[in-house]
């Protein structure tokens, strides 16, 4: 029978028959199990044969069936070898489906996927955008560290692709590469910065998601793209909108002042009885001055408002949380209607939305009161939905609607869902505590529930009544008597314990009932729950103190039972009570106060909403749902007291247009800008902005814009006129920007203050934009801001020629050192210009120069052991000398030894495996090395200011050996000579985020000046800075690659402690150096 089925399946159309056969087999008796397995196996064999067929139609049919299997959740991983063979198919449809399959299984079958990696690389150049994007997706799905450089190169190329779909996939690949190798963060940030400038709505959401994953703290990357993201938001795909809105919410909380400020308008009742005319005038001015919202803040709120109508619940929830966290309270009410609309969705969506509404309704009841009936419970609701609706109804309850809600709650108590009924009773108790007018009504209703047939309802009622009676201890003695009668019929431990606690607390008010209750419970003590036993012991102790004649023997009997109980908590409580209430020779002073201890007035319980403390989590996040901080959660920062400079969000439109001017003319145009009229500038800016909306415009200007990022506020003609010289001064520019950021901002503020018309215009823009809602006014506002920015730039550029001459004179007069550190070029940094304007030619100039090493350690490192190198041994050390092969390279000396009795020929460096950006200058090949001979050669390696390993092959005539050189962080520095004054000045500029410090504890003899000097220079190649204080030692250096200053301070404290402080722009290197210096200084 089985042979017939095999033969039948081999015929054409056997695939469909097999699928039908499978479905039929599943309904047959277990005896047909073999048929099921054989048909499964045969079906896969059939698919493999179709994939190996010469006909494209068969392959296409097989791939469609395989993708269909994946879509149904079936495992198709065993077909990977057969599928991957078709990755180079010329049929575009087959290739698409193959890539869909590979994206799913490449991570599981990494070894097989690596065999086709060359095909994927070729596919990255395919004319079809879908193939290019799919190849990138497959490549990024192969999670093997060895292909990280290939992935990085592919992402770089794809980020500049003409197709926005490919660029979108490049943004997705960034996240995968970062999770595979976090050390690539800096290079990935550069790509993210480039993609953030992309004007395609297809790319925006994906690149913001990559930004959130890789560098969410780099808010500076968002400044220039903020307005573009706000304007593109409506057209971005739905899930991209969610990510962008959440990111912009965090951004707004750091860049704008709070719109919730109280006291901006004076109240009438604050006015004094007698006021002078001036005081009345001042108060009237304050009363007229409302909160002026930043135009960019208003832009975000206005552009997200239409998204409240989105069909996607996640988008609506994202906009709702944005309004809740950053919009004025008077405007946040519009989100309530949209959130109520979402309650018609699935129960999962309802659950999340109701949780967020529950949090909102605690603080702002008025938002959801008009929609009270929307939160009434339906019989079809799930239990979790019912309980959340109860929570919201409780939050919205007030004197006006409580009567309606109580009638609703009476119906809920009768529900067959016992968990929901118990929650309703808890709700009634909360309403009774929050609204005193109905507390008696609620209490009477709960007492009526004590006669309910359902034991769970009675038990929950007892617990709630106990809490309510605790708030009014002097009343309701009859209720306590009634509850004592119910003790025989109630079996729920929590309810029995509550009744016993109530009787114990009020034992003096019910002197006849309490001893009888103790007698009954003493009989059943051994069979009671542990919670009830504890309350029986407490009741016995209280009665022993208040009515010992009647209850003394009974209490001793209960204490003896508790002494031998199985639960150690009961035994422990018994010993505690016996020592406290039964005085004996060993009793301490506490026994005198036993009555005060047991019968003290207990504070009333506080019935609060479980959502009260959730508002510190951002709404709509997983952390808010779980009420605990989830992995990857980004906290919302507090509003700043003073808004940061809004000019950082201004886009330099004129600068973008100038990139297309010839290189030789760019320098001449800069001083002539003052001859252009304002109207012409305004026209130019509007034209260039409209041109930049096209797709080609966004692509063509990106590379140049990246090279010049950060230079737009400086001399714009520098990079255009001297491209070659600009490359040579790259380190100088980055150094100037790093140290002058804060001064640049201050300088821009001063320039804006010098022009009254400019400041007046910007203030009028703020007022009009905060009052206006129309799109046309927002456009004119943005143009006005651009014009204002251009006026500020003109003011600076008019001053540039004079300052340039002065600074050139100064530098010519004082350029006395042959090897200066890369200092900021005068024409680039406004902060340096401001410093040089008041400089006197007779003043002493501060010059920071590279000095000779203070100490060169003789420590060598093994490069190649003689056993591994077949007799060839190699050691390397760092001579701390300037490298002759390049200014950015670290000099490395390698000593080669021949430990064999034969000559070793043709020693050279073979293949190199260097991280991205790293460069190596190898030594010349050595023709031969005699037996027992030794030779020392020099190499230069540019480590790019990192401690990454430089891997290469050391080869001889017959063999190649893989070797590694990993530099200590102290060898990536060059010593610097500078004065104490210059040191303090540079240290002041490198404070805050650029400063790391730690405390060192060591013996006093280890803090001698000579010891500290020897330990520091042994670890790091730094120069000694003269210090006028005996307890402070200063050292200075610069990084070899970028020339960034590294300032080290050791400040001795009282006792045997000291503080180690490192200031540098290179915070990673600074923290590594700190970790290496700390143990060295601590040890004896």
Curated annotation (Swiss-Prot):
It is a peripheral membrane protein. Pfam families: Adaptin_N, AP3B1_C, AP3B1_C_2, SEEEED. One of its GO terms (cellular component) is clathrin-coated vesicle membrane. InterPro entries: AP3_beta (IPR026740), AP3B1/2_C (IPR056314), AP3B1_Ser (IPR029394), AP3B_C (IPR029390), AP_beta (IPR026739), ARM-like (IPR011989), ARM-type_fold (IPR016024), B-adaptin_app_sub_C (IPR015151). Phosphorylated on serine residues. Residues 1-26, 663-800 are annotated as: Disordered. Keywords: Cytoplasmic vesicle, Golgi apparatus, Membrane, Phosphoprotein, Protein transport, Transport. Residues 718-729, 754-767 have a biased composition (Low complexity). GO terms for biological process: anterograde axonal transport; anterograde synaptic vesicle transport; intracellular protein transport; vesicle-mediated transport. SMART domains: AP3B1_C (SM01355), B2-adapt-app_C (SM01020). The modification Phosphoserine is found at residues 276, 609, 742. Residues 666-677, 738-753, 782-800 have a biased composition (Basic and acidic residues). The keyword S-adenosyl-L-methionine does not apply. It is found in: Cytoplasmic vesicle, Clathrin-coated vesicle membrane; Golgi apparatus. Its main location: membrane. Residues 1-11 have a biased composition (Polar residues). Subunit of non-clathrin- and clathrin-associated adaptor protein complex 3 (AP-3) that plays a role in protein sorting in the late-Golgi/trans-Golgi network (TGN) and/or endosomes. The AP complexes mediate both the recruitment of clathrin to membranes and the recognition of sorting signals within the cytosolic tails of transmembrane cargo molecules. AP-3 appears to be involved in the sorting of a subset of transmembrane proteins targeted to lysosomes and lysosome-related organelles. Belongs to the adaptor complexes large subunit family. Adaptor protein complex 3 (AP-3) is a heterotetramer composed of two large adaptins (delta-type subunit AP3D1 and beta-type subunit AP3B1 or AP3B2), a medium adaptin (mu-type subunit AP3M1 or AP3M2) and a small adaptin (sigma-type subunit APS1 or AP3S2). AP-3 associates with the BLOC-1 complex. Interacts with KIF3A; interaction is direct; interaction is impaired by pyrophosphorylation of AP3B1. This is AP-3 complex subunit beta-1. It comes from Bos taurus. The lineage of its organism: Eukaryota, Metazoa, Chordata, Craniata, Vertebrata.
């Amino acid at each position: 029978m089985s042979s017939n089925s095999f033969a039948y399946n081999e015929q054409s159309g056997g695939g469909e028959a097999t699928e039908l056969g499978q479905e039929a087999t599943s309904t047959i008796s277990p005896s047909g199990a073999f048929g099921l397995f054989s048909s499964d196996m045969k079906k896969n064999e059939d698919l493999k044969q179709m994939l190996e067929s010469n006909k494209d139609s068969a392959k296409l049919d097989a791939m469609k069936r395989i993708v269909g299997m994946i879509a149904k959740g079936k495992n198709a991983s065993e077909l990977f070898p057969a599928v991957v063979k078709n990755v180079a198919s010329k049929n575009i449809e087959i290739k698409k489906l193959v890539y869909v399959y590979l994206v799913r299984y490449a991570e599981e079958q990494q070894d097989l996927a690596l065999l086709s990696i060359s095909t994927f690389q070729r596919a990255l150049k395919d004319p079809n955008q879908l193939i290019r994007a799919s190849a990138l997706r497959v490549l990024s799905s192969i999670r093997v560290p060895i292909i990280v450089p290939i992935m990085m190169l592919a992402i770089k190329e794809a980020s500049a692709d003409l197709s926005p779909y490919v660029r979108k996939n490049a943004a997705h690949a960034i996240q995968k590469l970062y999770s595979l190798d976090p050390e690539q963060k800096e290079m990935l940030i550069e790509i993210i910065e480039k993609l953030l400038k992309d004007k395609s709505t297809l790319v925006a959401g994906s690149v913001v998601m990559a930004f959130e994953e890789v560098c969410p703290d780099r808010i500076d990357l968002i400044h220039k793209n903020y307005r573009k993201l706000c304007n593109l938001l409506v057209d971005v795909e739905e899930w991209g909108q969610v990510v962008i809105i959440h990111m912009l919410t965090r951004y707004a909380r750091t860049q704008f002042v709070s719109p919730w400020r109280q006291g901006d308008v004076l109240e009438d009742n604050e006015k004094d009885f007698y006021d002078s005319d001036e005081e009345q005038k001042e108060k009237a001015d304050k009363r007229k001055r409302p909160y002026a919202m930043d135009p960019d803040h208003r832009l975000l709120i206005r552009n997200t408002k239409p998204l409240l109508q989105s069909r996607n619940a996640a988008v609506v929830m994202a906009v709702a949380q944005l309004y809740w966290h950053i919009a004025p309270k008077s405007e946040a009410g519009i989100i309530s209607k949209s959130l109520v609309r979402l309650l018609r969705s699935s129960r999962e969506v309802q659950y999340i939305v109701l949780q967020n509404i529950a949090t909102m309704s605690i603080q702002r009841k008025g938002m959801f009161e008009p929609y009270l009936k929307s939160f009434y419970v339906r019989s079809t609701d799930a239990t979790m939905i019912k309980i959340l609706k109860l929570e919201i109804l409780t939050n919205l309850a007030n004197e006006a609607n409580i009567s309606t809600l109580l009638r609703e709650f009476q119906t809920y108590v009768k529900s067959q869902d016992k968990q929901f009924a118990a929650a309703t009773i808890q709700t009634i108790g909360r309403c009774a505590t929050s609204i005193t007018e109905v507390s008696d009504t609620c209490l009477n209703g709960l007492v009526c529930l004590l006669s309910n047939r359902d034991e769970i309802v009675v038990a929950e009622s007892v617990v709630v009544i106990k809490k309510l009676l605790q708030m009014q201890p002097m009343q309701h003695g009859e209720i306590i008597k009634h509850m004592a009668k119910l003790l025989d019929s109630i079996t729920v431990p929590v309810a029995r314990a509550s009744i016993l606690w109530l009787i114990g607390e009020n034992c003096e008010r019910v002197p006849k009932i309490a001893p009888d209750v103790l007698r009954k419970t003493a009989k059943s003590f051994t069979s009671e729950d542990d919670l009830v036993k504890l309350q029986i012991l407490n009741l016995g102790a209280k009665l022993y103190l208040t009515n010992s004649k009647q209850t003394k023997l009974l209490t001793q009997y209960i204490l003896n039972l508790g002494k031998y109980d199985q639960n150690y908590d009961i035994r422990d409580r018994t010993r505690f009570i016996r020592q406290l209430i039964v005085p004996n020779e060993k009793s301490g002073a506490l026994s005198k106060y036993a009555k005060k201890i047991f019968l003290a007035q207990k504070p009333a319980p506080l019935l609060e909403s479980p959502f009260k403390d959730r508002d510190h989590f951002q709404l709509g996040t997983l952390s808010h749902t779980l009420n605990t901080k989830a992995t990857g959660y980004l906290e919302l920062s507090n509003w700043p007291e003073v808004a940061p400079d809004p000019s950082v969000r201004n886009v330099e439109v004129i600068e973008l247009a100038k990139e297309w001017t010839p290189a030789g003319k760019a320098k001449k145009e800069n001083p002539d800008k003052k001859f252009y009229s304002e109207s012409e500038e305004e026209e130019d800016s509007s034209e260039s902005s409209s041109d930049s909306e096209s797709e080609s415009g966004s692509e063509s200007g990106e590379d140049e814009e990246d090279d010049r990022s950060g230079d737009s506020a400086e001399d714009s003609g520098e990079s255009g006129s001297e491209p070659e010289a600009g490359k040579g001064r790259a380190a100088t520019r980055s150094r100037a920007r790093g140290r002058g950021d804060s001064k640049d901002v201050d300088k821009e503020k001063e320039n804006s203050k010098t022009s009254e018309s400019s400041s007046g215009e910007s203030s009028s823009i703020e007022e009009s934009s905060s009052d206006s809602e129309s799109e046309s006014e927002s456009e004119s506002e943005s143009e006005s801001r651009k014009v204002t920015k251009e006026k500020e730039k003109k003011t600076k550029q008019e001053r540039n020629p004079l300052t340039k001459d002065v600074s050139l004179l100064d530098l010519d007069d004082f350029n006395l050192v042959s090897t200066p550190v890369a200092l900021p070029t005068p024409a680039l940094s406004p902060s340096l210009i401001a410093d040089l304007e008041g400089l006197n030619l007779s003043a002493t100039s501060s010059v920071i120069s590279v000095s000779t090493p203070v100490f060169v350690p003789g420590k060598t490192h093994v490069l190649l052991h003689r056993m591994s190198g077949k007799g060839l041994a190699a050691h390397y050390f760092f001579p701390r000398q300037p490298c002759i092969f390049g200014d950015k390279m670290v000099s490395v000396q390698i000593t080669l030894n021949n430990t064999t009795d034969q000559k070793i020929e043709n020693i050279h460096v073979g293949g190199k495996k260097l991280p991205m950006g790293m460069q190596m200058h190898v030594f010349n090949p050595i023709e031969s090395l005699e037996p027992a001979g030794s030779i020392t050669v020099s190499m230069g390696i540019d480590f790019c200011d990192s401690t990454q390993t430089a891997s290469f092959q050391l080869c001889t005539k017959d063999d190649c050996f893989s070797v590694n050189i990993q530099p200590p962080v102290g060898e990536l520095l060059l010593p610097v000579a500078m004065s104490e004054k210059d040191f303090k000045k540079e240290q002041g500029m490198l404070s805050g985020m650029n400063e790391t410090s730690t405390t060192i504890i060591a013996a006093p003899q280890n803090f001698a000046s000579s010891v500290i000097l020897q330990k520091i220079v042994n670890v790091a190649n730094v120069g000694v800075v003269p210090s006028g204080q005996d307890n402070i030692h200063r050292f200075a250096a610069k990084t070899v690659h970028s020339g960034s200053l590294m300032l080290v301070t050791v400040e001795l404290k009282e006792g045997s402690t000291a503080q180690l402080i490192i200031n540098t722009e290179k915070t990673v290197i600074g923290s590594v150096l700190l970790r290496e210096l700390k143990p060295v200084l601590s040890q004896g």
